[in-house]
UniProtKB/Swiss-Prot annotation:
Alphabetical list of SMART domains matching this protein: DnaJ
Name by which UniProt lists this protein: Chaperone protein DnaJ
Matching HAMAP family: DnaJ
Note accompanying the cofactor annotation: Binds 2 Zn(2+) ions per monomer.
Entry binding sites for Zn(2+) 1: C148, C151, C201, C204
Amino acid sequence: MEQRDYYELLEVSRNASDAEIKKAYRRLAMKYHPDRNPGDTSAEEKFKEIQKAYNILSDKQKRAAYDQFGHAGVDPSMGGGPGGFGGFGGFGDVFEDIFENIFSGGRGHGRQSRGQRGADLQFNVQLTLEEAAIGKEVEITVPRHGTCTVCEGSGAKKGTSPKTCETCQGMGQVRIQQGFFSIQQTCPTCHGEGKIISDPCASCHGQGRVRESKKINVKIPAGVDNGDRVRLSGEGEAGVHGGGSGDLYVQISLKKHAIFERHENDLHCEVPISFATAALGGSIEVPTLEGRVTLKIPAETQTGKVFRLRSKGMKSVRGYGQGDLLCKVVVETPVNLSREQKELLNKLQDSLENAKGTHSPKTSSWFAGVKKFFEDMKF
């Protein structure tokens, strides 16, 4: 299957800057994201292609290889390109790892050390259930390595710039012919960076990044749950020597609620009702995240009965649908009764015992079971 040009996929020119590529990726990723196109397989495939294109073009060395060799330069299964051993497919990388470690003194791939990407970071945010229900924008302060503003991430002293390594011509790797094998190894001059910094920046000591604490506004969508994460692309650690920045993951946790328990998008709660309301029926007010609502209790309601209030739970974090509120009624036993109240209850009990059909089906079944048990045991 013919692969599309990565620049065409991101709708940018071949000389587009890193910032232009990143901007185009964000726009297209938002447009074709599966959450915005549920059930649309073509949009999902487009999203995957866009991600793959960005992964290549956002990496300086991969982009250089792609510009020079096309898809073969970044796809080991296609053969050719700077990785070599293309005819062996996956075996090429195995041989390359072995020989590269031998000839480079164990430093590993120059591709990995050159323009090293910054690490991903995680920041924990705790919300109340009410905040999670409607979403919230929070300001967080993240300690991290940020791009050095003095050298703008280059690592070179202001007014100067890194020079292209003459040994590897900026590729970070050189080839050595060993018999039948053409062996690729890390450039011994620039150690895989592709550039030489002769006069490093005093602020970042040539690293291109410095420690900082950055304030970031995070929009947390409605419906988030424990363990959900919000990804902020490029807000992690800045890369070394101009490498791409990592991502920031905001980890969500919810505080325990005094009334509701959450099960996915449904909310559960227990609602106490009086003995009289359970027997005779009535109406009670129950709380929801949107305010109070009236719940009708039918006569002869038993404790443990669950009433479902549709669409009174949590919104789906994907933006469609809403859970329910399940109210479990608990019949209260009256306490601190007066003498008169006790006498009335005794009279009620006597009248119930002498009347037939006043027990609930569950109670009648239980008494019948107990009676049969004693008969079988012949007590």
